[in-house]
């Protein structure tokens, strides 16, 4: 099933998944739900008593920010594939989170994958400007290709010639 952005009524769809699984067929959900729509989806899984050991969910667009403030006990065992998790313990990530909390003046605010991507991208841009010796767009663009920068969660991001980063993928529960 596909839904529009911001969809919030998951009762029917989750019921269909539950009914399909009740026929004894191995069932899993591959979720590409984006943003705030994740909250009512996961709440509905809990409302219908769906547990990861019965119908596991693997999501490709949900992070700690979307789940902040949500009772995550019913979500134990479901998985998400993302390039960044705030909970990863590295010296770089710890320093990044500390700086973010000092800037925002709120220790409850989480960091997320887009923030890490911007952090990496800005630092790569700064490296490319230094390498090019100018801020000229064409020169910097050429210098961007092949730039490398250490991720906050370990590993290295690489800027490819298609203007996309190659970064490690993490699986979180």
Map each language-model feature to its residues.
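Extracellular/periplasmic Venus flytrap/periplasmic-binding protein
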Residues: 1-48, 87-95, 157
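Residues that form or immediately flank small-molecule/cofactor binding pockets and catalytic motifs
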Residues: 3-5, 62, 83, 145
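Residues within well-ordered alpha-helical secondary structure of globular protein domains
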Residues: 16-19, 99-102, 146
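Generic hydrophobic alpha-helical scaffold/packing signal
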Residues: 30, 42, 46, 58, ...
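Catalytic-loop motifs flanking and including active-site residues across diverse enzymes
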Residues: 34-37, 92, 117-121, 167
């Amino acid at each position: 099933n596909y839904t529009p952005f911001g969809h919030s009524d998951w009762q029917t769809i989750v019921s269909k998944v539950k009914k399909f699984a009740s026929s004894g067929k191995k069932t899993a959900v591959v979720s590409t739900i984006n943003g705030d729509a994740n909250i009512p989806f996961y709440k509905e899984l809990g409302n219908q008593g769906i547990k990861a050991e019965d119908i596991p969910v693997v999501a490709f667009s949900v992070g700690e920010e979307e789940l902040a403030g949500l009772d995550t006990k019913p979500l134990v065992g479901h998985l998400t594939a993302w390039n960044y998790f705030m909970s990863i313990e590295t010296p770089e990530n710890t320093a990044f989170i500390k700086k973010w909390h000092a800037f925002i003046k709120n220790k409850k605010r989480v960091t997320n994958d887009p923030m890490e991507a911007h952090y990496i991208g800005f630092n790569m841009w700064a490296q490319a400007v230094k390498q090019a010796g100018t801020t000229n767009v064409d020169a910097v663009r050429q210098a961007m290709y092949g730039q490398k920068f250490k991720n906050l969660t370990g590993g290295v991001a690489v800027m490819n010639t298609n203007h996309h980063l190659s970064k490690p993928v993490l699986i979180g529960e």
